[in-house]
Amino acid sequence: MTDQGVAKEQYITVGSLKEIADPVKKFLRKGNRKGRNQKELKFRAKVVNQQLADETGSINFTTEGVAVNNNQTYEFTGSLKVVDYKLNLAVTSATPAKDQIANLGSEQLSKADIDQHSGKHIVLIKDLINLRIGQSFFARPKDIVHNNEQRRMTATLADNTAAIQAEISVNKKSITQEVLESLNSDKVYLFSDVVLNFNESNKLVARFNYRSNIVEANDRQIQQLSNNNLSAKEYSDETEKKALTDVLQIHEKKERVHKQQNKNKNPRNAHKNHNRQRPNLQETEPVKISGLQQWNNNQTVIGKIVSLRTEDKSLPAKQDGTSTTMVYLKGTIGDETGVIDFDMAEKRDCPRFKENDVVKFTSVMNKGRQSAEGKVGGHYIEVKKFGQYIILSDHNINNVNLNNNLSNLELTARPKNPNPRFIKGEFVGVKEEEKDGNIQYTYTVRSKEGEEQSITIRNKITTLKVGEIHKIDRERKRSSSRPNHQGGQRGNRSHSQNNRNQRNRDKHHNSQNNQPNKYKNTSVQNNNNNKNQQRSQSQNQRPPRNYDNRQGGENRNNRQRNENNRNNFNGNGHRVNNQNNQRNRNSSYPRNNNYDHHHNQQTDISGLEPGKRGQNVTGQVIEVSEFSKQINDKTLHFVKGRIADENANIRFDIKKPQNLEIKVGEVYNFKDVNNKVDDNGYHYIDLNRFGRVFPSHKKFQSINDKRNCDADRSSIEYVKKTVPN
């Protein structure tokens, strides 16, 4: 080009290749498939000692029939590759540049080893991080033990820094039985995509999954193997093991919860789970035993287990004859103020406590037992469905007041709701009365304990029988009828009523008395009676599936005809689809709307969960900078910096918003962010596809702008916080 300034803008620097490392890793992992080839990069660099260098850094390169001279500057085109475990530029063309590059940068991009299989850096065994997924390292196997029946083997992988026990199984891709049998203790191998996890002996071992790979490294030598076995430590402390396991399971666990929450938020599933959603009960402050409130189902108490016994109870048998046995924990818990009995079902996700343990109960309800006369007896507590019991190993209660036993005191009757939504029990009778010119009915039922409950509604229910068990709901017109799924609750006419009106109208307009068509008749006469008959048939029964491919076209025609005939007429003569459109018109989502993250929850910076999408966070910008990237011949602008609130601060790296300038000292709301972890194990947030940034009116009295010695890292340290040394 003639304009030198324009020509320079088309080329990227060598140092900026580090910025596009992640796309290169993804490319290497997926392989050089059709349609996934990298586009060629354009850059200016100087040939210096078998490397290409400019003002930002240097990188190794290879040429394919391209001749270059040392200490000369060229305009190159090429792509990134991995050659001999080093990041390399494959040059396809070189044109001498008009001006030379004088000052060269010191950063070397080809210094670290890169695994071509996973696209990640190769580390030493001593630098392996506990429970991190997808790590690669060079090692020599020793103490190899094969198990041909289970198609797996165990070995100790070692280099000159450390060793670790490994459990290798055959996968469907790269690790075959022949590969396992060919492993030799005298050779060095590259083990790719390895995860550290616990074995049956509570020790950390290296495990291989379906992505893992084992390749012989002929150009690598490990002379002396280290005896520092990382698997020698046994994690006997359940608390320490659980803290490590949470790091590995947090992504898939949060993903399951996130999918279930999105399923519950879908209006189409509202009738399935409107009674199954977990209540948003926040843990309350612990209270003393003597301060337990009666009939309050959201209390927290801490006490010492005085006595404990278990009791098995079989649930009613199912239709297939199987029955489930529940384990109930019963005993006494106390503190300095008194003691009280407890009676609750054992929870599978909570470890069982024993006598003299200090335990915290959450979502506790102070209840009372029913006597034979129907009166409420003494106190006892129960952990509700969504509560937990947690063993507090660092808490101690020395003196327990055994003289004040709350279970011996009489508990007042549970307060009744003066206006319940529904009542259930043995029907006693109904009373009719007039109020404000309207007739209303008061229905009375008797519970199993002999208590009578009443409910007053305006609807008269004629299906109730004295002495039978009924549930009377205020919101339903009938007590024991199923919902009308054909539009009755929405005020629409049912299909049978529509069909009856259509038949009467068709008889009036057409005097011909044709025989009704058979089901799936391909010849349909052009008259209203036949159309109406086929409408009725298609609505009341569905055509059976036909798996004969030779008649697929005919069956498709019949199904399409039945779909078209489901369009009924309303009272005004207009054609509408009562079966789908009217019922779901206001309950479906737009096609391009990301309804997975409609209900994002606001959280503090310290409460951001790693790997979880759809989080909202508000913070004050304490530093900001802009930079540009050349991606696919396009220049994209990005903004990175750091935001902080009262508790913590974190880095952000996002695409520059349109019509918004992010300034230091201003407060912004980051909506729908993803808390990611970089290769060094530290947090940063970026925006998801539908995320955005906008100013916030929130004010902070003080912010936490403290950071580590390395200002490039966030204050939330993923590795140091979750994994002990």
Swiss-Prot record:
Domain of life: Eukaryota
Biased composition (Basic and acidic residues): 468-478, 545-564
Cellular component per GO, a single term: nucleus
Annotated spans, Disordered: 252-284, 468-614
Keywords: DNA-binding, Nucleus
Post-translational events: The N-terminus is blocked.
Position of sequence motif Nuclear localization signal: 241-258
Residue spans of biased composition, Low complexity class: 517-544, 565-593
Subcellular localization, as worded in the UniProt entry: Nucleus
Major site of localization recorded for this protein: nucleus
InterPro entries, per the entry: NA-bd_OB-fold
Composition skew (Basic residues), residue ranges: 256-277
Coiled coil: none
Annotated GO MF terms: DNA binding
Function: Binds specifically to parallel G4-DNA, a four-stranded structure stabilized by tetrads of hydrogen-bonded guanines.
Name recorded for this polypeptide: G-quartet DNA-binding protein TGP1
